[in-house]
């Protein structure tokens, strides 16, 4: 990804005064970008290629099957690694990709709950996400631009499906005229281990999920 390199959030007016910034003057709680070429301003020349693509370079799976004394268990694990997920789909030129995470700083659109709950505010000065703004007004519209702030390692491991069953002994079933009886419970997507915020499906982190 070609993005700006983020350096956390601005935490004071003094920090803003002594930093380079992009576009209009930022506010406390906005994302701070690094001036990579040292020219005293943040522009397209400060973008650099960082991280990996958004498709796993490595995918893997594991199927387990076991049986004992009438009980049987099967499970399917899937996973992916060596890829990055961007929590924003807004590019440096303002073009919006088709992801729900794009919409956090767009007027009339929704923001993910994790972002709202952890955004910088006066009441929450230690917030880990930038302050929320109305539409694209002021520097807040720049917080959604593609930068390392929004890149996350997409690796994950998921229990895709599991089934637990029990087959009743024939000696129990024959007297009631039943040849074979098996009961089971089954589940899908039972748990996922990943470093992404809650609500993002690492298999397809897009607008349709």
Model-derived features with residue positions:
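Membrane-embedded beta-strand positions of outer-membrane beta-barrel proteins
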Residues: 75, 183-185
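Repeated loop/turn-to-beta-strand initiation elements of outer-membrane beta-barrel proteins
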Residues: 70-74, 171-172
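Short sequence motifs at beta-strands and strand-loop junctions characteristic
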Residues: 52-57, 149-158, 209
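Transmembrane beta-strands of outer-membrane beta-barrel pores
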Residues: 68-70, 79-83, 161, 168, ...
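Predominantly the C-terminal beta-signal and adjacent terminal strand-loop region
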Residues: 192, 196-209
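Membrane-embedded beta-strand positions in outer-membrane beta-barrel channels/transporters
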Residues: 61-63, 161-165, 209
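Extracytoplasmic gating/loop element in the C-terminal half of outer-membrane beta-barrel translocons
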Residues: 9-28, 80-177, 181-182
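Acidic carboxylate motifs that coordinate Ca2+ or other divalent cations, activating on Asp/Glu
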Residues: 35, 39, 43
């Amino acid at each position: 990804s070609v993005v700006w390199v983020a350096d956390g959030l601005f935490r004071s007016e003094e920090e803003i005064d002594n930093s380079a910034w992009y576009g209009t003057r930022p506010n406390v709680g906005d994302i701070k970008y690094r001036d990579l070429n040292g020219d005293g301003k943040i522009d397209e020349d400060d973008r650099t290629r960082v991280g990996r693509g958004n498709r796993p370079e490595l995918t893997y799976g594991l199927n387990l099957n076991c049986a004992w004394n009438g009980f049987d268990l099967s499970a399917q694990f899937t996973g992916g690694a060596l890829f990055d997920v961007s929590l924003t789909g807004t590019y440096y030129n303002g073009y919006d990709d088709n992801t729900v995470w794009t919409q956090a700083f767009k007027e009339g659109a929704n923001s993910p709950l994790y972002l709202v709950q952890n955004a910088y505010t006066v009441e929450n000065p230690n917030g880990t996400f930038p302050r929320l703004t109305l539409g694209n007004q002021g520097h807040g519209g720049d917080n959604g631009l593609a930068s390392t702030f929004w890149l996350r390692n997409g690796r994950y491991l998921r229990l895709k499906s599991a089934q637990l069953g029990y087959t009743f002994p024939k000696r129990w079933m024959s007297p009631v005229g039943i040849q074979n009886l098996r009961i089971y419970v089954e589940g899908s997507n039972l748990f996922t281990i990943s470093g992404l915020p809650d609500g993002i499906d690492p298999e397809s982190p897009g607008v349709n999920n």
